[in-house]
Each structure stands twice: as structure tokens, then as C-alpha cells.
């Protein structure tokens, strides 16, 4: 087993290492004081607030808060701006991610436990993870569970390690959890095994031997191993546990004995496979405790092996006649109706089955069951819309209606002509008509309803099956016939005008759903009672919110009357003015029950506001509910305007302005409801006097309306956009029937044809292209950056709404190539958002089967509603389907169907909210402190957010009467967002997007935007490899260019080469013991390898922690787009680490100087404080290449940050290499200096300058201001005669001579402003002395001599190797240095041409040492190695104890020998080119074996 990481002794990552982190988690940005310099900053102000758990509440907390505290809230007008202002943007919107994105890797924790310590929960976690792997396909659950209980976890650190040799004895069965291995067979053939594949023994105790040699292909390969003995025992045990059911000599069913836990209490037989007939019969047999979901699983999946549901239906009707089976049959039917009512709706045969079953229940006097069945039908029935046309108004209606508000019912269809269009449209007996042509029919007199239906030739009707109440209506009518007197409501009368639209009383759930039909005399809409209630309400100001909205109702318990609120209670007058529930026996009463179960309708609370105008343009705000009619609004408006006339003289008119400027005016029907939802942004409601014909809206007002209705994304609140996206997504998500997943997966033909599923599937593409379209259509660069920033904030709010689908779509949109290439736009984005973006996309790191995302999803505090990432759902289901056979031995593989059903149930639970989703997504506003905007059409949306104080909920009293204007503005913003989203014009064609992208930023270079994280462009020679961190991206290689030299300058901006997996130290292959040296057995081999890796880790704690400092900044190799575009967000602590915008791995934030046409600045002040011991500089004056070497030792407590020198230290050594390029000095010509500056300017992504904010737009200016003015030695003479190494080794003596004043100046500056932008722009001057060569090879970065010979100096391999000597012939130099800015502008013309900067050398593309390089032209055929190979090579770390002698050069793993292993290269002493430096050596080369030395 892989031991846990040793406790950190540096105090920075100790928190993290208490438990071993998985490979990909250690790459997350941890906020545990990674940078001591920013430890005083609260998490709310740190750059990475998304990972800070500063006590901010998760949605579930807020939800609970709303439940318990709703009654205490005071809602008096609280200030809130409708749109996020720039000021709060950075402060508030971003700082309250609901919980950290990083969570523990639970699976890893379980694996690392000793098998005997694993609990049942641990095994369940492992089972959940393992069942998706192909290796476990076709195994039964019990086998998997047993294997999970005994598996041992092993990690092999390094790529290229031999796991098994040919002919070795095998002693385990292993499955790959992460990474891949390659098996090379003796005949030369090779096979690659990747995640989920298995290798090793078969389930027998015979000796087996390895065929071929197995090597790891990548670092950090993870395996689980099961010893041969255990594997054999478990797989052979299966047969013993099997129970076969035979009929007529044939096996018809196979069951397996299972124990679900170790207590022995949950054990029994579970169906594994069987014939379709036998499985159907099992529905009414006894089910064991270990198979509680058989009926649900069967009812969901029968469609995969039965051609028609009637096959089951007929059997059930048959079995119903057997008294012993009757209860079981009834239970099956109730579950069927409750879970899959869509099987019955629209299927005439199944509808007849249901009717026959109801008749059977009535016949057997099973009233309770019948009642439950009717309740389930009513609750599960969905609204259906249909359109009917009549040839003329006089044409008779093709159906007969019953009911009406005078009887206390809705309008019901009693019968339909069988040959009419209505039947074809799907209208049937028992349907309740809810709406006709937009007019609410839930509370209307029958005569009025008939009049509306007769007077229209075009009828758009919304209906819903409601047999439960329809039967109640029929019973009432038959009673009336018998008694001869109509039933009259006893309490009050039904004058509509007396209805108040302000709720009368806070209601308990029982009251909401307790409008039971027991007391049939009651009327919900009473006058006397309501007036009393109104007075009470006015006096007491009781909150309008339910104290516990639906908290006490269990969702899945629909079979119990008391649960659905239909218990026999004394009548409680309806306190809610729900116009649909005007009678206790009204059909929609069921909707109160329905709300608990489904919430497709919402309680009638006045959570909406209308703004009503008069002809003189005065306006008033009127509080209404969703069901308030136009007539009621007129009554309220008359009261608000203090008009004396009667309501009959006035009507409500809608005035709207078309985009062409045409003013339209129409009178609204009195019964029209949902008024707040109907009004357009370009429309207004007017109170119109019917007697007058005045113009309601002048032309000026119309123009203003038109202007208001034109909206752009930047005008919209990011919170509101995220809320509306979430509501829209959630509506689509929860409408998906469980059967649609099955139909889609098994490609079954169904009535619905998976329409809801397809819609939800399309949303992710639409949202992705929306992001790209919005950004690329904006021509202004600054606005483009703001739109990107806006989208990052929207994604963040989607994260808070637990809308992972939209979050992923937005991230994908920002990563689309046409958006990703907008280099200068991304550079303007503030670092904070870069960091947030990286954190957001880090969540979707695909490694280990999306382990991070799955961890968050399975987190304890993630309660519904959740909108999961749909592609992952689809992948999991496809995996289960394709990884397991549907039939085994001719029998239906029910184990497979059970797993699929379980997965679908799990997905369904995410949509099972017991509160209106609009409210759930709505309870978040900035800082949780201001008035929550109320949803358009959401009932309880007035439940407010909770002020957060140190993570504790602060209870605040608020008045229950809301500030209507504030609510209106909120609703108006919601309306704007809705209109914006509904009118989106998407550009779905990637070629068109690319064209738009090129119009925004023409291609000045073929490179991707920031290599640090824009998507790499594929080239023939360099396959794009996964990115390993903020600084590491595959760069396009110039096919014919030899590897480009790369040089380090400073340790100040440089972390010693770090590994990608900090907690797993890499060591050179030569230091590894032979694989399996401790044991001839495979299981122990993998484990021993894993343990040796950890021993290395303990030995190299120092290096390890350095690794951590940098790796914390890197994100997983495969994350969608893994890094900030401008280097590290570490610059927060005042560092200039963000220079390295190159393709070098995060292993060197240090980067190539020559290739980047820039010099790092070297920290010289605070040497003791930073423990920077000394540096060595060698300058190759003949080549014109300045090289500076820095050797550093850092004390343990400084590891994580020591190497990130603060900006204040980095100023001193500017251009030092230019001064001391040899024992004498050389004049820096104007031409060279200026070219250096310009090359840096034009280097695009290759240079450090591209990192600094805004530096690209006016690079010359910056260079002018920063570069030259900061040279304090424009015409200074130096008479220092010591040799160069002496100067550097002296701890910065020369620096102090040269730069003491400027160093202090910058120290002061930096302490006074910690602004990122300034730090970055100041940083840009450090890169201006780039090429020292006479000539620069345009796009390759190869330095040429004047004589035309290429010299490819050795590139850094980002590894810990000793300093090497370089070729440098002493050239006499005048002691005069002239540096003037005068010629900076002279070279601008050359900027776009051949002096464009090349892509920087990717890590691991190691150059050929000068000593090996033949004189003469370069070899065009020489190609770099595969990027992956180079990357792995770049992680080889030389052990400090083996630092070679001063004369040695670093490993010469050259680009032309991709297969070679690192080896020490000993240059020939006789090589004349090395002569000048041979005797000199390095002053401090052997001074301290622990020092980290950078390679050049």
C-alpha cells in the first residue's frame, strides 16, 4: 500500500498532507496559505475565493434557513441595485462560492485503508466507483463487493517503469485505475492497457506466467490488486451462492445469495437473470430484504425485453382474481402509476387496463386502494396542450362539459365525440380544462366557459387528466338528482370582486394541502371569513410565508392518505386565495397535494408586481399573484389611483411597441391571468377609461419603451442570468421521464421519442455556442474582455445554483478555439478572473473518470435541486449498457438492468425537490444580505436569503409587506434576462466563429493565445499533450528547427524544477531498483514499487515541498483548459512570477531567456531573508547570448515561497548580464538593445511581457517607460576587475554596486502598492534585453553567429542538474556601456516580420550540448521527441547527493535521440570551444550538496 505523505515540516502544506491527496487533487490551487505574503488576506479577498470555505453557506443551508426562519423575516425595502455594479463585482459576486470546489477524494481514502479496516460504507463507495470499469463487467454485485473488500491499492510513480517482465510468475489480478501500461510481446507486438482494463491471473490456483514485458506509459499509474488466492476464492464462491430455478428441465431463473453488510442481518437471494415470463411472475412473489427495488427496477426496464406493457397488464388483471395475490398486484399497479404514468397516458390499451383495474377495486370494495390510485393518477398527470378549430362560431362543440365554479368544481369533459378532431387531438373523458386561449378556466362558471368556447373558432386548450375529482363531481351530481335539490355552498357567496390578492394568513402545510373534501359545504372563497382574516393580517403583520414550506412531507410516501394531506380533518378554511381551489372538493385541490409531490404549480402568493400606467403617464405598482385576473388588477388600480368611478368603466389595456416602432394597443379579457408573465419589455399596462378614446402612449414614450427593450448581455445581472439558466435547465431536466433514458439507451421506439431528453441534451451545445457567439460578435476589445469576465461570473453563480450543466457549457464556450485564440483580449482579463476560471474548469478535470466532479456531486451537503452534467450521465449509462451483456445464457441479464435502473433513480433524485425550484435558485443574492428578487412565476420566491456572519445565520426581522418598486425592478431584470435568452441568435458553425474570431484579432502569428492555457495548435511533429499546469501547454513546433536553446536566469522567479505530482517524488530511472526487487511476485512487485516511491519521497522532502509550491499552481494534465492566461495568480503576493507565459512547464516559471527574448530580473536585496545563497553567471559573449546561473538553497520553512521572489527584490539585477558578460565589459549596441526590446514586445505568447496586463497593446510605450528609464547606468563606467563568477558568487556585491538605489526605489514602490496590474507592468521592463545575438532566426529562436553557423545550445530540461560551463570566448570590451532609448522606435517596422517571437521550448525538449554539436548547418531532419516523452523526461530529478564535478554538463537527452535515457555527459577536455571556462569552474559548485542548481 502506498503510505501517506510524511507530515510537512515547512508549515505551509501541512493541512493538506494530513491525508494523502490523490495525484490530481494536489494540482488544485489550495488556499491554505500557500503564500506567506498573503496570509493576512481574508479568504474573501484572496484571488481564489472559489476554493475558500469562508463559512459561506451552501444552498442546502440557505434552504433550511428559509424553512426555519421565513416567519421571522422583515422584508422592508432593502437597497439593492438591479445590475451588478462594477464596484461590487469584484468584492461581492465572486467571493461567496457556496462551498470549496476541492473536496476529499473519498474513493482514494477508502483505497488507502488497509482492507481489514474498511467499513461497509467504504466498500459501498468503492463499489460505486468500480462498477463503471470494464474489468468488472458481467460480474454480479456480490462478486464486486467481495473484490472491493480485499483489493489493495498501489501506485507506480514513473513512466517507463517495468511492472512485469516476460516469464515472471503472476500472483494477482490487477485493474488499472489511472494511467496506462504497454505490454510488449516477444514477437515485437505491443498492446496498451488503460483505465478500467485488467491483467494478471485467471480464477484458478494454477501457476501462471507473464507473457511479454509490461511498462507504465505515464507517471502516477494507479492499480488495485487482488491476490490470486482471494480472486480465485471469490470467483469460485459465486457458483456455490447461485440458486437455479428450473421448470421442465430448463433453467428459467438464477438467484444469488448475498449479504449486504457484515452484520448478517441483510442477507438473502436476489434475482440475477431469468426469462421474461419468470421475471414478470416474480413481481408478485416474496422479495428478500436484499432485493427491495425489484418491482421498481422491473417496471422501468421491462420495455427492454417485453414488446408491450399489456403483457404485464394482462397478467396483473389475471392475478388480481387470486385473493392471495390481490394486495401484491395492487401494490405493483400503484407503483407503476406513480413511477411511470406516461406508460398509461396516450396509450388507449393501458388506459382501458387502468379503468378495468379501478372497476375491480370498486367491485372488491377496496376503497382505500382506489382512492390512492386516483390520487396517484391526478398527481402524476401532466398538462397537455391541444389546438382545436371550428368551421364557424355556430358549429357545435365536439364535447360535453360538466362542473363550474357555481358547483365548486372546475370545468370537466364529460364525453367526446369519438369521430371528432377533439378525440384525435387527445381530449378524453375526465380531462379538466385548465386554460383556453390564455384565459384561466380553473375558477369559472360553466355558462361563461361555454360562451368563450363557442365564441372562438380557434381554441388553444390546456387540459389535465383528473379522474379523482371528476368522479367526485359525478357523485355530487347523482346526489343532487336523488335529493332533487342542487348542492349550494353554505358559507358566503361567490362574488369575485371580494377576492383579495394579498394572502390572508400564514398557512401551515396542513392548511395548504388540507383543503379536504370532507366538509363538502365549505367554500374556499368566503367573504366574511376573508375580511376578518384581512383585518387580523393588517393588525398583526403576520408573515405571508409558510413557516415550513413542505418540510414535513415525505416525497416518496404517496400511498398514504395522511401524507398527501387528505386526512379526515375538520374543515380548515382555505387561507390561500388560490383561484383554482375555490372549493374544498375542487379538482385543483389535488394540486395542493400535487404541489407537494411535483410542484408543477405553485401556491398563490402575491409575489409579482405590475406597473400600471394611466393616460397621463402616472404609474402605480400593484402586487398580484400568478392567478390574479385582469379584472382584479383594474379594481386594485382604481383604488391605487384613487379614481372614483366603478370598475366596470375601466379596463386593462396592453400597449406594446414593435421593433419597427408601431404602437399596438389591445384590451385584455377580464379573465386573463399570469399578467406579469405576459408583459413584454416593450410593453406597458394602462388603465383605460372605456368611455374615452385618448392616446395612452405618446411617440416619445414609445421610443423610450423601444430603447428599454434593447438589451445586451453586459446590462444583465450575472446572478439573474445564472438563475434563469438554472431554472430553464432544471425545468427541462425534471421533465425527463425515467423511461426516456431507457428508450434512448436501448434505442427503443416510444410515443414520446425521448423529446425531453433531447431538449436537455441540446441545451449544453446551445449554451456553449452562445458564449462563443456573444464574445466574437463584440468588436470592441475592452467590451470583449468584460463579456468574458461576465461569463466567468455567470459560471460561478451557476456553480452556486448547482447547475453543473450550464457551468460546463460556459467553460467549454470559453475554451472553444475561436475564443481561446483571442490573445490580447484574454490578457486584459484581471488575474482574479483568470484564477477563478481555472478553478472552475478544474472541477471538470477528466482524469480518473471525472473524479473531482463526482466527489462534489456526491458531497454530503449537495441537496436537490442539482442539475448534473448531462454528458457524464450519458457516459455512465452507456458504459453500463455496453459493458454488460443484455442476455446471458439465453436469460435476461437482470443484474445489468438493476444497475441501470439504480443509476437512473440516482439521477432522478437530483430533480426531486420539495420546493419550487424557482425559489431554490433564487435564494442567493449578493452577500446573502439584500432582498432576493422574486421569480417571475415562482410562488414562495419571497423567502429571503440569510445574512451570513462568520458562517452563522443571522436572524433578521423584516416586514412582510415588500417594497413593491424593488420587486418590480427585480422582476423587470428577470424579464430582461428571459427576453434576452429567448431571442438569442446562436452561431453554431465553428467556421463562421473562426471567421469572426479573425475579424476580432487578425492572425499575427500561428501560435495559440497564451501557451499557458490557450488551446494548443496541433502540428505534425508535436502531438498535443495534456497540459500539466499553468505554465505548461504543448507548443506547436517548427518542424525543421533544431531544439531551441533555453536559458535560466534567475532563481528569483524560479522554482527549482518541480514534479507534476508533488506528493509522489520522481527520481531518475537509474536510481530505481529493478521493478519487483523485493519480491518475485507481481502483487508485491507493484506494492514494493509503490513503497520505494514513498521512501524516495521521505528522503527528498525538501525537493518535494518545492514541488508542491509550484504544483499547487498547476491543474490536472487533462483539464479542459488548465491555467491562468497570464502566468500564476501568485503575483498576488507581489511576485513577478507571471513572466513565464511560455510553453515551459510549471516546472519552470523561470522560462527560457533567449527564446523568450527576455531576461529575468534577479533578486538581490534581502538575500539573507530569502536564503538565496549566490548565483553564477557565465555569459557567452561571442554568441551574444547572456546567461546567468543562479544557485539557491532554501531553508525548509521557505520552500513553498522562497523561490517566488517578491517584486521588490527583483529589480536590482536588470541587465546585469549585459554588464558583466566576461571579465571585461562589452558595449551594448543600440541595435541589439532595441531589437531585444522589440522582440520581447512582439514575442506574443513567447515572451514574459505577454503576461503583463495590457502590455501588448502599447508594448513600445511600456518598453520605453519601463525598460530604459530604469537603467541607472546609461553611461556608467565599471572598473570592477574580478572575474565574473567572483562577482556573482559574492552574494550580489556587484548588484549592490550597480543597483542599490533602484533596488530600494522599487522596494518602496512595491511595499506601497500590491496591485497585480502594476506588478505585472513593472515586470515587463525586465524582459527588454532579449536577444544579444547579432541575428535572430525569425521564428525559431535559434541564435546565429555572424558567420552563419547555427549554434543550438543546450536547453533546460527542467530538471535538477548541475550548472554547466558554456562556450564563451573572451572578447575585449570597452568599459563603457551606452544604453539609450533613442533608437527604440527605429525597429518597429521589423516587428511584424521576421523578428516575430518563436514558441518557447517546451520542457524536456533537450538541446544538444555544444561539445556534441557538429560545426556546420543544422540538420533539417532532426525532430524533437514526442511531447509526452519529453514531458516525462523533464521530470527526472537528479539527487543532490550526486551533484557532479564542476566540469560536467547536464544530461544530454537530446532531441534527436528520443529513446535515450538521461545519462551524464562528460565533455572532452580537449574540446577547444570549452577551453575558456574549463579552468575557471564554478566557485560554489560543491559548496553545499543540498543546493538546488538550475541547468542551462
Swiss-Prot record:
- Composition bias, kind Low complexity: at what positions? 1025-1038, 1110-1124, 1140-1159, 1440-1455
> What does the annotation give as the result of altering residue 1175 to A?
Blocks the gel mobility shift induced by PLK2 and affects stimulation by PLK2
Question: Where in the cell?
Answer: Cell membrane; Cytoplasm; Cytoplasm, Perinuclear region; Late endosome
Ranges of biased composition (kind: Acidic residues)? 83-94, 1485-1496
Entry keyword annotation includes Ubl conjugation: yes
Tissue expr? Expressed in the brain, heart, lung, liver and stomach. Expressed in the granular layer of the cerebellum. Expressed in Purkinje cells. Expressed in cortical neurons and coronary artery smooth muscle cells (at protein level). Expressed ubiquitously in the brain.
Domain named Ras-associating: which ranges? 606-692
Q: Which cysteines are joined by disulfide bonds?
A: none
Q: How is it modified after translation?
A: Ubiquitinated by NEDD4, leading to proteasomal degradation.
> Where does the record place the modification Phosphothreonine?
644
Q: Which residues belong to any copy of the PDZ domain?
A: 385-470
Q: Does the keyword Ubl conjugation apply?
A: yes
Q: In terms of one coarse class, where is the protein primarily found?
A: membrane
Biased composition annotated in UniProt, kind: Polar residues: 1246-1256, 1306-1330
- One Pfam match, given by its short name, reads PDZ
Q: What is the effect of changing residue 806 to A?
A: Blocks the gel mobility shift induced by PLK2 and affects stimulation by PLK2
Identify residues that carry Phosphoserine.
501, 806, 930, 933, 1022, 1079, 1088, 1094, 1115, 1119, 1158, 1175
Tell me the ranges covered by the Ras-GEF domain, including all copies: 717-944
Annotated residues for binding of a nucleoside 3',5'-cyclic phosphate: 135-252
One cellular component term (GO) for this entry is: postsynapse
Write out the domain note. The Ras-associating domain is necessary for the Rap guanine nucleotide exchange activity. The N-terminal regionis necessary for cAMP-binding. The PDZ domain is necessary for its targeting to the cell membrane.
> Could you tell me what this protein does?
Functions as a guanine nucleotide exchange factor (GEF), which activates Rap and Ras family of small GTPases by exchanging bound GDP for free GTP in a cAMP-dependent manner. Serves as a link between cell surface receptors and Rap/Ras GTPases in intracellular signaling cascades. Also acts as an effector for Rap1 by direct association with Rap1-GTP thereby leading to the amplification of Rap1-mediated signaling. Shows weak activity on HRAS. It is controversial whether RAPGEF2 binds cAMP and cGMP or not.
This protein is called what? Rap guanine nucleotide exchange factor 2
For this protein's source organism, the top of the classification is: Eukaryota, Metazoa, Chordata, Craniata, Vertebrata
